[in-house]
Amino acid sequence: IYVNYSSNAQQPGVEQLRNELNYQNPLSLSGGNPDLKQSNMHSVYIGYTAAKTEKSRTFSLNFNGSVTAREIATKQVFFTEDTPLPEYNGYIAPKGATLTTPVNVNGAGSMRLGAGYSLPVKALDITFSANAGCAYSRRPTYIGDELNYTNSLSPNLSLSLIGNKSLVYQFSLYTNTAYNRTSNSRKSDNNTINQTVATNLTVNIVKKIYVTANYNYSLYHNFSYADGDVNTHILNLTFG
């Protein structure tokens, strides 16, 4: 069992802390925030691995997560009329201008749980492996002057077969399926799925002459669109 904890602090930049307004472009203003605090991220990782060397079997389980306090985000305010800014010596922001400033936000975090298993199938001279995981993240951001929280959930599963029959043939088969669901405070959802399949086969026809075939397939589907599928097929053959 392996356990690790770490902490990281991010200090605001000097420009971010200056109580000054950049008005070189009167319609695109930017200013500092002297009340900005440093952000602190706390991370933890826990891993477990078990192996049976006599049977060449392995099992692993891991978890990692992090939370961030006072993350530094960018806030943007749009002015619908001429507006004085007392925090910047009373400068009057003209109608139609935007003001961009850094601010601290809370609520950022992420976590992931994963597991893996591998074992040989001696009767077929192949090794089977499976890996599964699920990740979740929550990220606060500003859309204009409105604080928005984006949540993302991403489970995935991958399987593989690897075979090696001495000098006769070598082959591998790999497949991965990943689903992603993203939602935010504005009730807009986005759901996608990615599927990939990759296979490789090398056969020794006669002495020192080999045929190698590689096939790759990928599928991307966006559930938000009726015609959101993207399919790709690639086949390569080599002789040597």
PLM regions: where:
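Exposed, low-structure sequence patches enriched in small/polar residues
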Residues: 1-240
